[in-house]
Amino acid sequence: KIYNSAKMTLEEVLEVMFEAEEKGRTTVRLHTGDPSLYGAIREQMDVLEEKKIPFDYCPGVSSFCGAASALNLEYTLPDVSQSVIITRMAGRTPVPEKESIESFAAHRVVFLSTGMLEELSRRLIEGGYQADTPAAIVYKATWEDEKTFVCTVGTLAETARKNQITKTALMIIGDVVSHSHYNRSELYNPAFTTEFREATK
């Protein structure tokens, strides 16, 4: 039997699991993307652990990984970026002040903020980004109707409006989007010794 959890409360979801457990059935609680990111799974696991109902937690492919694939980019380019911040704008679920958009000035992936792009641009610029910083909007990453739009921090909202993107998208911010300048990784450099091979130059 298939249930659409989008129309269910946490209690209703858990009740389905409890009933299945009593009948010796297996329940698959399927999340989009990777459940560890904005998946609201901790509250489910806590109850299952309390009830001593065993479960397996299987990782998925997050849309930020799918978005990188869609844009043919690497988030961690030598001498460009070695860090990625996964964040979101505050909505009904607040964001801790120390994790606000303005407090981070790095390469980042922004979830759940497609309807607030003008504010996102403003706050990124207030936080130290230039308006011409490379950016991208990826709509429905890894889906059949996936769409990608390369723009800048200053044109995020305009790009979304022009292409009628209002939800189900994430934004990638930083020079990794343009991947126009970076140094080669030392990992595969013939002059670099690793645990598995000696340098040859």
Predicted feature locations:
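Class I S-adenosyl-L-methionine
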Residues: 1-58, 157, 169
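Short, ordered loop/turn segments at secondary-structure junctions
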Residues: 7, 32-35, 61-62, 91, ...
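A contiguous loop/helix-start segment that scaffolds small-molecule binding in enzyme catalytic cores
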Residues: 12, 22-27, 83, 92-201
